[in-house]
Amino acid sequence: FIKLALGENVKQANRGYYERIRCPQTRMGVEQVFYDHFLRARAYEQEWEKYNSLSLSEKRKTQAPREDLEMNTLVEILNKERFITCHSYVQSEINMLMHVADSMGFTLNTFTHILEGYKVADKMKTHGAGASTFSDWWAYKFEVNDAIPYNASILADMGVVTAINSDDAEMARRLNQEAAKAVKYGNVSEEEAWKMVTLNPAKLLHLDDRVGSIKSG
């Protein structure tokens, strides 16, 4: 797995008097950073493919491309060998990153927090992304003002694999209560609500063959 991030967390990392010339400063800048790095990774992969296609005698006369651990990681993403979980809130940014992923040929595994997921649930289903969201957090910063307690149920109704997360050590002890809010607000069945804190997180982590559910015997 690898974690990416969108929104104010990314922009504010470069905020301050001495950091005003750094990129990204805008959401458009964040998008460009993603494209720049993935395009570099694609070119890096092609360099290695070209080198590896040489015969042994040709390799002895040719300098190998420089090993770049950052590009190796991005190539793994492009080749669907590494899963992405992405911090997100706003629908425009969620759409943007799915567009980047679609254009580069990979799939986003999970959007975390994703409090505007209900606005793009159909697009997430089409793309193949899952959701790990808060039950009813809202308005703790400007970009989450549109959060609603029906988010998890709407995502689940659209066929998105949906989990409820805590982001808090104390709340993690009471995820059953967080799941119950999906029953209260979204009319989700108790079984589906339990899946949001058991089986569905296991699916998003690709561990559902080992944890997340129980069977007779």
Task: Please name every model-derived segment.
Residues 83, 125, 129-138, 142-217:
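His/Asp/Glu-enriched, well-ordered alpha-helical/loop segment
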Residues 85-90, 107-116, 136-141:
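Catalytic beta/alpha-barrel core
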